[in-house]
């Protein structure tokens, strides 16, 4: 379990996640890097769910990005199609948020590719806490940047969700 949150504000997109990995009810590691840059550092992805499954999906997404020359939506849709139809991938338990400088999407194992209605997406066990905090800050605080809103949302999620820690990685595109 984890928290990944993505915010768009003033032409910037920031995505961040915590670093906690659990096995059952035990914390196995607190410094997992769940947010990574891809495709010439122009795309950032964050994952929630099974770590091994997420790495497989991230690698597949990176291949789709290369194939489609960095076109985020096309790569995400093609990944979702393959995820749903390829028998070996159907059992993978993970979700991803993918972002570039102008758009960001949620990609799920059920084949969903969702563009946010508002300028916030969040996934993982602390996702609803982070989304609520980010939406509130986005609507009421004009001084915070996208990255600062992501940081505050992750702090709040980590204070509430036992599967989210305070070791954050935040990237901005």
Curated annotation (Swiss-Prot):
GO CC annotation terms, alphabetical: HslUV protease complex; proteasome core complex
Assembly with partners or alone: A double ring-shaped homohexamer of HslV is capped on each side by a ring-shaped HslU homohexamer. The assembly of the HslU/HslV complex is dependent on binding of ATP.
Protein species of origin: Mannheimia succiniciproducens (strain KCTC 0769BP / MBEL55E)
Activation and inhibition: Allosterically activated by HslU binding.
The keyword Kinase is annotated on this UniProt entry: no
GO biological process: proteolysis involved in protein catabolic process
Subcellular location per the Swiss-Prot or TrEMBL entry: Cytoplasm
GO MF terms held by the record: metal ion binding; threonine-type endopeptidase activity
InterPro entries for this protein: ATP-dep_Prtase_HsIV_su, Ntn_hydrolases_N, Proteasome_sua/b, Proteasome_suB-type
Pfam families: Proteasome (PF00227)
Family the UniProt entry places it in: Belongs to the peptidase T1B family. HslV subfamily.
Reaction equations catalysed: ATP-dependent cleavage of peptide bonds with broad specificity
Active site residues according to the UniProt entry: 2
Gene3D superfamilies tied to this protein: Glutamine Phosphoribosylpyrophosphate, subunit 1, domain 1
Biological role stated in the UniProt entry: Protease subunit of a proteasome-like degradation complex believed to be a general protein degrading machinery.
Protein name listed in UniProt: ATP-dependent protease subunit HslV
Highest classification ranks of the organism: Bacteria, Pseudomonadati, Pseudomonadota, Gammaproteobacteria, Pasteurellales
Positions of Na(+) binding: 158, 161, 164
EC number: 3.4.25.2
Keyword field: Allosteric enzyme, Cytoplasm, Hydrolase, Metal-binding, Protease, Sodium, Threonine protease
Keyword Cell division applies: no
């Amino acid at each position: 379990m984890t928290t990944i949150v993505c915010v768009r504000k003033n032409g910037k997109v920031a995505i961040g996640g915590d670093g906690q990995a659990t096995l059952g009810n035990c914390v196995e590691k607190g410094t997992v890097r769940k947010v990574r840059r891809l495709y010439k550092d122009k795309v950032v992805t964050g994952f929630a769910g099974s770590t091994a499954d997420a790495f497989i999906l991230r690698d597949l997404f990176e291949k789709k990005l290369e194939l489609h020359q960095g076109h985020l939506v096309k790569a995400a849709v093609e990944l979702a199609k393959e995820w749903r139809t390829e028998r070996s991938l159907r059992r993978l338990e993970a979700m991803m948020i993918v972002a570039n400088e102008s758009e960001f999407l949620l990609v799920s194992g059920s084949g969903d590719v969702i563009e946010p209605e508002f300028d916030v997406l969040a996934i993982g066990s602390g996702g609803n806490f982070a989304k609520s905090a980010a939406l509130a800050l986005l609507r009421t605080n004009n001084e915070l940047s996208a990255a600062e809103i992501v940081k505050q949302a992750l702090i709040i999620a980590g204070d509430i969700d036992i599967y989210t820690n305070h070791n954050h990685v935040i990237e901005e595109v």
